[in-house]
């Protein structure tokens, strides 16, 4: 693994690469959050066949922090992704996103229309906040009544502490990561979560959206992205199966895979199945 920093708009942005010497079309990974960071586990193993690049977005773990929380925006992150691609001098590339990283990639594709991007891998995608919220509300109805009430009270009052936090963690154990205990790699990444970025862009939890992404919606324009797309989610994913099917129908060239006995972090929960699915897609890219 090699790593370094790129100067993107005056900010130091960390990146790493696995399998740099490989000749197949490289993958560039956009992590989730916003405010999360790169997790090379599992995904770096695709470097057996091609280079795999990761980078931490502004505010995330190994990269610079913004001078002001107002600097965190979809527009900035799209420009940053474009800057990373230019700085690394890719001619052809496959973009892989996780959760918010999928929305970032989708925004980049629709705004910049890059000819260099040959395919997309979108795992547990956030592409429409309204559809995301539809999934969350459906999941919440299946929780114990006391937890439903705690979530409703928190959202009504704006107090996201106490019982709201307890309900939130119960929800995460069902729909974000079903492994027990959570793996060290996830705990380490969560320890580095930048809440300034997360709360500015998203909100206090995965199912309560109060930030800049509240009205985010690429769904009406997905038909404009005509390259091959692989969509994945877990069968218990907070990014729901029904919504994934809606996205598949919207993209002109999309296939989807639902990973069994898994949730939002299905690449960590079921790594062997995830690798088989992605490698099958990559055979033709």
Mark where each language-model region is.
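Conserved HGGG/HGGXW glycine-rich cap/lid loop of the alpha/beta-hydrolase fold
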Residues: 7-66, 70
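Glycine-rich His-Gly loop
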Residues: 29-33, 99, 234
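Conserved hydrolase catalytic core segment
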Residues: 91-135
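Flexible "cap/lid" loop of the alpha/beta hydrolase fold
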Residues: 118-162
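Catalytic active-site module of serine/aspartate enzymes centered on a nucleophile-bearing elbow/loop
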Residues: 253-285
């Amino acid at each position: 693994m090699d790593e370094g920093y790129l100067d993107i708009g005056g900010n130091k942005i960390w990146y790493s690469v696995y399998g740099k010497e490989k000749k197949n079309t490289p993958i560039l990974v956009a992590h989730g959050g916003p405010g999360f960071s790169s997790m090379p586990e599992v995904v770096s193993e695709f470097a057996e066949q091609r280079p795999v690049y990761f980078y931490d977005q502004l505010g995330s773990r190994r990269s610079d922090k913004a001078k002001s929380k107002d600097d965190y925006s979809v527009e900035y992150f799209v420009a940053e992704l474009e800057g990373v691609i230019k700085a690394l001098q890719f001619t052809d590339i496959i973009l892989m996103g996780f959760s918010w990283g999928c929305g970032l990639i989708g925004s980049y594709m629709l705004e910049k229309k890059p000819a260099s991007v040959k395919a997309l891998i979108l795992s547990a995608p956030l592409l429409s906040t309204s559809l995301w919220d539809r999934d969350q509300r459906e999941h919440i109805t299946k929780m114990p009544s006391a937890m439903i009430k705690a979530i409703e009270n928190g959202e009504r009052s704006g107090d996201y502490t106490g019982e709201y936090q307890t309900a939130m963690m119960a929800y995460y154990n069902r729909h974000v990561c079903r492994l027990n205990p959570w793996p060290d790699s996830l705990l380490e990444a969560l320890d580095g979560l930048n809440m300034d970025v997360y709360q500015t862009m998203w909100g206090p939890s995965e199912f309560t959206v109060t930030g800049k992404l509240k009205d985010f919606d690429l769904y009406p324009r997905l038909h404009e992205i005509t390259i091959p797309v692989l969509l994945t989610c877990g069968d218990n994913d907070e990014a729901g199966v029904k919504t994934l099917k809606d996205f598949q129908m919207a993209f002109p060239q999309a296939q989807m895979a639902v990973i069994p006995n898994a949730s939002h972090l299905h690449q960590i929960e079921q790594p062997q199945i995830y690798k088989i699915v992605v490698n099958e897609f990559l055979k033709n890219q």
